[in-house]
Amino acid sequence: MATDVLQAVLDRGADPESLALLSPDSGWTLAGLQVAVHQKAAELKELIEQGQVYPLIVHQDVDSVIDMLALWQLGVTPAPLNPKLTQAELAAAKTALSGVRSEAQAIVWTSGTAGRPRGVEVSFAGLSANAEASAARLLLTDDDVWAASLSFAHVGGLA
């Protein structure tokens, strides 16, 4: 299940020096972001194992993007958690995921409108289809920039 998302983009012919990520503090090319992701993956490699589900508090920032891409590269399933959750909610999510293994690309949490929130496995194909459908509907080109307006803990924020 290991997925090197940036390498897949480059393999499709993207310019390594094209803008991949823009934050208030900096801009990242595909090549620069790939280096940062490889470094993060090397740091995490000894701490986690392929197939593991890894709960991760995510913010809408560069570090969270790098963390998610590094986990995917290692074949680890991130379970992004909203930093606005209470300590009790975060603890419950981490307890529920303890020891869980998955081949999913991510595990995102439902809102709990029909009961208690639960983790839902999301595939890479599903995330890709969502992103491609959004790009097609909005007529996006390689020159456009996408604003990360949804939390990375939300399925729409991952796509």
Descriptions of predicted regions:
Residues 56, 138-159:
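Conserved AMP-binding loop of ANL adenylate-forming enzymes
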Residues 29-31, 105-132:
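Conserved AMP-binding A3 loop
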Residues 26, 42-85, 151:
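Conserved AMP-binding/adenylate-forming
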Residues 86-104, 131:
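Flexible, low-complexity linker/hinge segments
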Residues 3-5, 14-17, 97-109, 116, ...:
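Conserved pre-ATP/AMP-binding loop-to-beta segment of ANL
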Residues 17-47, 61, 86-90:
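Conserved AMP-binding/adenylate-forming core of the ANL superfamily
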Residues 1-20, 35-38, 53:
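AMP-binding/adenylate-forming domain of the ANL superfamily
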Residues 54, 71, 110-113, 146:
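Conserved S/T- and glycine-rich ATP-binding loop of Class I adenylate-forming
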